Amino acid sequence: MTQSFQVGDLEVKGFSDGILKTSIDFVVGMDRAQSEGLVGGTDNGALFIPVNNFLFEKDGKIIMIDAGAGNTMQPTLGKLPGNLRAAGIDPSAIDYIVITHIHPDHANGLVDDAGAAIYPNAEILVHAQEFDFWMAESDGATPVKVRNTRARNRINMKPYMERVRRMRDGDEVLGCTPMLAPGHSPGHTVWRIGTGRKAFVAWGDLVHFSAIQISHPQTAVTYDLDPDMARQSRLRMLDMVANEKLAVAGAHVNEPGFGYLSRKGSGYSFEPAA
Ligand SMILES: [Zn+2]
């Protein structure tokens, strides 16, 4: 069943791409006993996190946030197109895809196994800083992780190249405004969507392990290309979200993936939307 929440005049629906198996070993700067305790224990460190996508309509257009992993990562992922169809939404009906960052679990699902667009009519909204970094040429000094993701991102973006809108902070399309929150990736973006206080943020991977990083926002993960910068972005953005009482749609926040932050101790707690 599709879950939805209301933010002002927007009805935001959550669509799962599936479950990503990861590891508590990827937590940086917290001892193992504490991180195990926060997630309620693991079997040999295995941690299972959701890959959430969101969709809403505005002015007769259908806008989706991120595109899932496709068939490229784990068999438990790549469920997004099927879940859209099950809800009566043909992927060809999607007009815009807002991208938080161009990592495999958010962008590899843009294309099918043959490299054809799964969303043939969608325009991509992405921060220029993120797009330019991943579309740049690699050289001998480029870390392997970056080189591989760049190579894959050429495949992801190829059928969309004529309809990519490179945006910067302050730009707006249908109420969607990017706010640079770098660190996890160089142009990682928190999108503010809606009007005034009747807005929500799609915060991408600002928080990767929600059971740990919302209550302990100083804690980074090895997925962050620059963990210190990611930490600063997280602290700054969580503060803003809590101050403004904005609703949150989190790419890897445990079910239902959306809700509100409140301050608790030196961190925050997450109240799921009803
Ligand atoms: Zn992610």
Model-found features: residue ranges?
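Cap/insert and terminal regions of metallo-dependent hydrolase folds
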Residues: 196-274
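A short acidic, glycine-rich active-site loop
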Residues: 37-47, 88, 150, 221-234
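Active-site metal-binding loops of divalent metal-dependent hydrolases
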Residues: 17-19, 67-70, 102, 129-130, ...
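Active-site metal-binding motif and surrounding structural segment of the metallo-beta-lactamase
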Residues: 75-125
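Histidine-centered catalytic micro-motifs
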Residues: 97-107, 181-188, 249-256
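Residue-level marker for buried hydrophobic side chains located in beta-strands
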Residues: 63-65, 98, 124, 200-202, ...
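Metallo-beta-lactamase
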Residues: 78, 85-86, 93, 120-180, ...
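Conserved beta-strand hairpin/beta-sheet module of binuclear metal-dependent hydrolase folds
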Residues: 2-87, 190-205
